[in-house]
Amino acid sequence: MKVSLKAARVNAELRQSDVAEKLGVPVDRVKYLESKEGSAKITYEMLLVLCSLYGCTPDDIFLPIDYPKSEVSGG
């Protein structure tokens, strides 16, 4: 079952401020990425970083967009 970025963060027992600190961005940026509008604009590279923090894979995360197979598989 796929989860939202927010659910993945909560499952990892992290606060938005924890993630912001690890990424070196303002808390508002993390809030935006967790919003429907923000998650639709997230880059694959940022998704990989967040998944690393959350202990999951991009396949575990529900996003309102689909990345092309070549971008996901690297080829």
State where each predicted segment sits.
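Residues within the alpha-helical elements of helix-turn-helix
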Residues: N11, K22, L53
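Short, charged recognition helix plus adjacent turn
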Residues: A8, A40, S52, D60-G75
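Short coil turns linking two alpha-helices in DNA-binding domains
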Residues: R15, P26-R29, T43, T57
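A short, Lys/Arg-rich alpha-helix, primarily the initiator
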Residues: M1-A12
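Recognition helix of helix-turn-helix/homeodomain-like DNA-binding domains
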Residues: G24-A40
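Conserved hydrophobic/aromatic packing and binding residues within compact polymer-binding modules
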Residues: L5, V19-A20, V30-L33, I61
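Short Lys/Arg-enriched helix C-cap and helix-to-coil transition segments
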Residues: T43-V49
